[in-house]
């Protein structure tokens, strides 16, 4: 029986990744390096013989443009795609736009690590009159006030990502379609925690590098049997370590 595969990709480096700022739902674009990473991810997938029947991404352009670049390399720019806010990055509340290292200098490395990677820890909330509140953005006009976050923990991110997985993505995989998901560090961490049944301590230490394809293989019951990155292992480990170090004081 053929192995069922799923490809997950965190967006390439964004302009605010480059500036080491908390991004969350702020709609910042890819940096030049990020576009290069996305094209390289597409080339890797092409060289490994991947092709897709359907794509999912968020409503934030750093993920959308990553997907565009990947599909362009695969000559699949036409691929049917669904965009959902449920695949957005976690909302970083009042931290959005702040420099991570400067925030660590102010509050300490451990507090920032908990805000960035803790399971149930929420960053300080936005107020609804803050220009960063998603209720001011027309792309979220169909959401209820209860669905619009003022801040999110990873646990709250899981609460929106996993129902979307169960109701939208998994049924498509079960039907035999080959699926790629281009999303964000924390929406993908939410999915990895669920698929691999990771503990809160394990997920705290999981950092997903930008622009690197992460492949899941499933058994006939659609349970994960293997998870691996495509690319040079040393380079990927260095990129993941760099992600972890973003939240430390200089």
Swiss-Prot record:
Site residues, Transition state stabilizer: 184
Pathway: Carbohydrate degradation; glycolysis; pyruvate from D-glyceraldehyde 3-phosphate: step 3/5
Catalysed reactions, semicolon-separated: (2R)-2-phosphoglycerate = (2R)-3-phosphoglycerate
Function statement: Catalyzes the interconversion of 2-phosphoglycerate and 3-phosphoglycerate.
TM region(s), chain numbering: none
Lineage per the UniProt record: Bacteria, Pseudomonadati, Pseudomonadota, Gammaproteobacteria, Enterobacterales
UniProt-listed SUPFAM superfamilies: Phosphoglycerate mutase-like (SSF53254)
Quaternary data: Homodimer.
Database matches in InterPro entries: His_Pase_superF_clade-1 (IPR013078), His_PPase_superfam (IPR029033), PG/BPGM_mutase_AS (IPR001345), Phosphogly_mut1 (IPR005952)
Amino acids binding substrate: 10-17, 23-24, 62, 89-92, 100, 116-117, 185-186
E.C. number(s) listed in UniProt: 5.4.2.11
Residues at the catalytic site: 11, 89
Gene Ontology molecular functions: phosphoglycerate mutase activity
Superkingdom, taxonomy of origin: Bacteria
Family classification: Belongs to the phosphoglycerate mutase family. BPG-dependent PGAM subfamily.
Top-tier EC class: isomerase
UniProt-listed SMART domains: PGAM
Protein name in the entry: 2,3-bisphosphoglycerate-dependent phosphoglycerate mutase
Keywords on record: Gluconeogenesis, Glycolysis, Isomerase
Pfam family, one: His_Phos_1
Single GO biological process annotation from the record: gluconeogenesis
Organism (species): Serratia proteamaculans (strain 568)
């Amino acid at each position: 029986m053929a192995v069922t595969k799923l490809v997950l990709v965190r967006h390439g480096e964004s302009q605010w990744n480059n500036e080491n700022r908390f991004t969350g739902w702020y709609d910042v674009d890819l940096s030049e390096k990020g576009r290069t990473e996305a094209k390289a991810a597409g080339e890797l997938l092409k060289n490994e013989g991947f092709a897709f029947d359907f794509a999912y991404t968020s409503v934030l352009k750093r993920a959308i443009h990553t997907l565009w670049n990947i599909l362009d390399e695969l000559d699949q720019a036409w691929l049917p795609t669904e965009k959902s806010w449920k695949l957005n990055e976690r909302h970083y509340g009042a931290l959005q736009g702040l420099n991570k290292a400067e925030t660590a200098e102010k509050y300490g490395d451990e507090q920032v690590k908990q805000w960035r990677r803790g399971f149930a820890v929420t960053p300080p909330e936005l107020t609804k009159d803050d220009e960063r509140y998603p209720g001011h953005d027309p792309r979220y006009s169909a959401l209820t006030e209860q669905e619009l976050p003022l801040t999110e923990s990873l646990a709250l991110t899981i609460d929106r990502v996993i129902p979307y997985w169960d109701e939208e993505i998994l049924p498509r995989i079960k039907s035999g379609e080959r699926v790629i998901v281009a999303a964000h560090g924390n929406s993908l961490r939410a999915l990895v925690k669920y698929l691999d049944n990771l503990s809160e301590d394990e997920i705290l230490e999981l950092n997903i590098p930008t622009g690197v394809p992460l492949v899941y293989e499933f058994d006939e019951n659609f349970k994960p049997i293997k998870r691996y990155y495509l690319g040079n292992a040393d380079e990927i480990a260095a990129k993941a370590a760099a992600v972890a170090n973003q939240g430390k004081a200089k």
